[in-house]
Amino acid sequence: MVLYNGQFKSYDFNNYHKKRQHRKGKNVKKYYDDIFTFDIETTSAWVNEHGNVIKYKRGKSSEYWNSLQPLSICYIWMFGVNDVVYYGRTLESFYEMLGDLPQDGKIIIWVHNLSWEAHFLFNILTGVKMFCRTPHKPMKLTCDDFPNIELRCSYMLTRLSLANWGKSLGVKKLTGDLEYNKIRTPITPLTEKELGYCERDCIVVYEGIKNYLKQYGRQEEIPLTQTGTVRRVVKEKLMEDEAYNKFIKTLVPHNAKEYKMLQHVFAGGYTHANRMHAGKIIRERGEHYDFTSDYPFQLCARKYPFTPWAYIPDKTIPDENTYNDVAYIMELKFTELRCETCNSYIQVVKCSTDSRITRSDNGRVLEASELSITITEQDWLIIKNMYSFKSVEVIKLYKSYKQYLPKPFIEYVLELYGNKTSLKDLEDTLSVELYKKSKEHINALFGMTVTALLQSDIIFDEETLEWKIDKLTESRVNEHLDKLRNFNQREKRYFLSYSWGIYCTAYARVSLFMCLLGSDLINTTVADTSENYKDDVELYADTDSLFLLGSHDFSWYNKWCNDRLIEMCKYHKIDFAKTRPKTKKGKEKPLGYFLREADFIEFRTLGAKRYCERRTDGKLYITISGINKEAVYMLKNDIANFKNDFVFDKDFPTVTKKLPIYISNMPAVTYPDGYKANYKSGVALRPNGYKMHIDDNYSKLIKYAEIESGDLPETFVNSMRGKWV
């Protein structure tokens, strides 16, 4: 790594290309082709109650650290030109270096996690402009000082940590060389080992962007996000057909009100704990089942809304026998609604504000005297098999005729699934790269279908360093929808229907409840059960998986998957074998199957995204949103410690959760080594733990978990948990 001392003033930046801004235009722009990378290392510190600058120390409470003024400072920056990395020690010297770069052409600088670096650059740049979807998270950044320079976030492109990105590239990211709690400033001496760590981060990004150039050719052609990489491929496959271009524009929502309705109807995966077992320590053998690429299966095997949504004046719930060919959105009003199963489905947040919900189950409705909700016909299949009610009234009803998704789209899904299956564990370079690419793309396909058609503007105030969201107005949404609907051939931003994403997750929820309730849910009610009924032995559900007591057979569901795929393949004239590619060992892996994973012998859940299991290998495993798996060691190999109010200590060695603290009003301070800093903006980072707390309402619902079965009548305990049968 080379100390920067004005070398770029005489550097020959002769690696560039020129291209027209428009196909027939005369405006030609120059782009520099060297791969430029940027990274910083920072110190977090705090001003204590005595006015001293201190480093983070273990043993103090979060409340203590929250009471102190946080500080942060950049003590070294690195700037890579291809595989040569330069460095400096102050932000001001980085500003000077930017001024030494060429000014006559576009320069893209890649930054891994730009949201971090940006908050330090605010101290030196003026006229900052950013493209963001959420506050503090810019995807790209420009400024008035150097208008030809664009900083791009490579993390948004990869969604990988530097360590994992480097690993996938065969470039090892050095770890463990920097003591992050040590206070360093621009005058702190750094060892060769520490400098080597700093250099490696830029090298990883350089190798990563070089790899992307194999696909995209030019840096300006690389998409901003991971989803953007697959969006481009799918768009090219679909929009080359002019007839499709015209057709898809007919599916743009009519207006802002329809778009808002569709957004409200959308719901993600079903993640919930069975209230009859929540809180209990289960010491029985059970099975864990998981759908094989669930969303890709739903995209291939099911039919989707293919005509504009049309209002119909009917006031009765449509015949379920039409659901395969017609999509419905219904606004329904229930009276005296009650959940009759061990699991509850209706989300409280999806109900209208005038609903009278009298009892809930961790965010889902158990009882309501009145309830209004807007749902799809797929949601209705689940609700009428789980809830009883005195009456249901159709307030509004819309319909759209269904069809399979376009053949090129389905073929691409199957191609990615085939690559992901057949190339896994192969070691040659081509197979490894294609496997990685296929896995990334197939995971991004669903996200692409539910991307918001229009984002709220994120506004950054350069004077106050504050962020705010400029909410969308109805007129602005209508204006944007009109543009998307423009039949001008060049308008190709809308190439997948937003409704398709809504139905992908709706179908996935139906598949989960088919396996839970033991039928296809058509023409059945809450009173009907089958030999495949699992609701009472299910412990936990998470989007595409179930944890169940006992031994089970889902071959009936897997046959149902086959039948759906056979029908689709027959319609589109696709080889059915593509839905069941073979692994490295020659074993078929059919798309969509519900397959058994590792069994468990102990299990406990405290609600959504919070469960602990002991598998047959004897080890404990935890799944807690925001907490790393290694934190399980705090439980001391005892599942009984996984309980309400248990604290995953922020200072425990295997708890790696961090809390970023965005600072916009840092005071001028003198650090312990005498360095005087007068920066306003930065980000401090400190360890952050997690307390497993159950809210009062949910606690009351499941509080009888610890009572021995003989202490109270079973019917009473069940009724307290909301089961009346």
Feature-to-residue mapping (PLM):
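N-terminal accessory regions of nucleic-acid-interacting proteins
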Residues: M1-F36, I40
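Conserved acidic
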Residues: V28-Y31, W46, K57, S61-V111, ...
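N-terminal G-site helix/loop of the GST-like fold
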Residues: D33, E49-G51
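Ser/Thr-glycine-rich phosphate-binding loops at phosphate-binding pockets of nucleotides
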Residues: D39-V47
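Conserved Walker A/P-loop ATP-binding site and its immediately adjacent core
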Residues: L114-W116
